[in-house]
């Protein structure tokens, strides 16, 4: 098929289904995306912007995954904002037989900026919440083996869960707090956020060197060791001292 035939075929498709590509006439209901909202302890509902996730930020978790903490710079990936949910029911994803839990401290930004100093990075923090980062561990292993990105393992419906956000004005800068996850009443993960290789302020400052951060951005700061599989029907409770618990059930 010649290039001209391809172009003519595309033009015909556009004319049939969209009338005019220049006018962006869309023959369907195309609504603006709805950003999920998180709830604060003082009753506000605020929209999520972007979701940044830090990997291998606890030494023992890095070891249990067969790796090590990168001491040169944090390693991060992103989830789509619409992959986030507040629960309490969380959908078990398709395309996996090995879904893993990862409890995390989440920092919520109230303002942003570029190339932030540590002082300015601290000032961007609006508050904190307990979060869960779910992983298709079998698909992640496949991606690692082939040298591919982790997106298939980390980005899907209900791939991230965020609890009620406690403003920093209520709790201060969080540097030391026990963090844990219970599954069906049994503690699976346990640690302290002071075990992070890079603390929350350092993570925000680093991310600001890569792109402009904005209000509503979330930073999942990594998980302690003890990650493992969960199945439909399991009841999970994420806990961090000083923050509201995050309960959920997989359906």
Residue ranges and their predicted role:
Residues 4, 11-12, 80-81, 224, ...:
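Generic detector of bulky aromatic hydrophobic side chains
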Residues 21-126:
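Extended, compositionally biased flexible segments
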């Amino acid at each position: 098929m010649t290039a001209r035939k391809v172009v003519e075929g595309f033009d015909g498709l556009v004319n049939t289904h969209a009338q005019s590509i220049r006018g962006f006439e869309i023959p369907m209901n195309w609504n603006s995306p709805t950003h999920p909202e998180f709830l604060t302890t003082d009753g506000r509902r605020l929209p999520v912007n972007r979701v940044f996730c830090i990997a291998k930020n606890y030494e023992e978790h890095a070891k249990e995954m067969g790796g090590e903490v990168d001491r040169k710079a944090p390693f991060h990936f992103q989830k789509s904002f619409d992959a986030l949910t507040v629960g309490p029911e969380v959908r078990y994803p398709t395309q996996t037989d090995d879904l893993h839990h990862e409890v995390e401290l989440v920092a919520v930004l109230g303002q942003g900026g570029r190339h932030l100093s540590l002082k300015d990075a601290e000032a961007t923090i609006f508050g904190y919440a307990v979060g869960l980062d779910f992983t298709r561990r079998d698909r992640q292993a496949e991606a690692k083996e082939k040298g591919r990105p982790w997106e298939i393992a980390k980005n899907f419906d209900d791939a991230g869960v965020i609890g009620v956000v406690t403003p920093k004005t209520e709790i201060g800068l969080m540097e030391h707090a026990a963090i844990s996850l219970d599954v069906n009443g049994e503690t699976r993960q346990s640690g302290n956020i002071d075990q992070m290789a890079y603390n929350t302020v350092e993570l925000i400052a680093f991310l600001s060197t890569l792109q402009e951060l904005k209000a509503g951005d979330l930073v999942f700061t990594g998980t302690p060791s003890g990650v493992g599989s969960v199945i439909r029907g399991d009841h999970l409770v994420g806990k961090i001292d000083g923050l509201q618990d995050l309960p959920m059930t997989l359906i």
